Amino acid sequence: MNKKAFTLIELLATLTILGIIMLVAVPNTVSLFEKNKKDAFISDAKRLVALAEAEIRNDESIDVSYGGFIVFSFSYLDDGSFESDPDNKPYDSANSFVVVYKRGNATSYQFDYYVQLIGSKRGLDLTLSKGIEPSNVVEAPKKQTITNAIKTVFNIASPTIVNY
């Protein structure tokens, strides 16, 4: 007998096998996309910090007292390279910024860089730049104002802030 079609059993077996493959492959693919979006978000946060570091190094008019804070707004630092967040929506420029904290004294001081970056679906609450990791990216960021974020992180009632 010359068969030119599949039997119902063969079709059901094939569909079952494809269904099992989909159950395994789809969640892995989705988690891979999420991981890539978080990595891109972290990359943007680090780039924002790098722009603030360059601004501190290159602009001698920027000065802050020891124990004081310089805040660079997202809008100030954006050189046009931040077209959109990893979800293809604009960053929340009103709630995204870099805080530079000058610690030490006249003979020995250091700048610590903190970043808060808020996107459309995820965000990074004010975090020390050295500790930025994908695990810091949250789905529902706090969207704190500059003053509240500094008060929360540094436990200071009324911080001295210089805005740029």
Language-model segments: residues:
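Aliphatic-rich helix starts adjacent to a transmembrane/signal segment
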Residues: 19, 28-49
